[in-house]
Amino acid sequence: MKKILIAVAIVALLVVCWRWSAAIPQDLDPLKVAPDTHKLVFENRFVRVLEVHVPPGKTEPLHQHGRRVVVYLSDFNTRVTDKGGQPVDTLRKAGLVRCSEPVIHHVENIGKTEGHVISVELK
């Protein structure tokens, strides 16, 4: 039942975010600048799905995402710094699903558990 609810939430967020979709950026593509943490699991003309594993203590290099739906699969603590912004520490909880606007940032796992995320980028 929980998997069905997560799937329904993802589909609903995709529909809501669809009209605000943007092209996937190329110059700071996480698959190119952070291939050790970002893996492509699916891509078609509508979406690109990335699986992200960030081990404790790892800081990802500056990278960019287009509009996307993010699904957190594990609990972990992050320090996220948007380009030109101040660091923000956040506890990410397993099961959280959110829609995200385009961003250029770097992410540091400041906790003791691996961060596991699915990112559905809208094209």
Positions of predicted regions on the chain:
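A short glycine-rich, His/Asp/Glu-containing loop-to-beta-strand
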Residues: 34-61, 66-70, 120
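Ser/Thr/Pro/Gly-rich low-complexity linker/stalk segments immediately outside membranes or between
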Residues: 21-29
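Positively charged n-region of N-terminal signal peptides that target proteins for export
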Residues: 1-4, 19
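Ligand-binding loop in jelly-roll beta-barrel domains
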Residues: 75, 102-123
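Histidine-centered metal-chelating micro-motifs
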Residues: 57-60, 96-108
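Hydrophobic membrane-insertion alpha-helices, especially the h-region
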Residues: 7-17
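Glycine- and acidic-residue-biased ligand/ion/polar-headgroup-sensing regions
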Residues: 65-84
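Short acidic-glycine-tyrosine-enriched beta hairpin
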Residues: 84-102
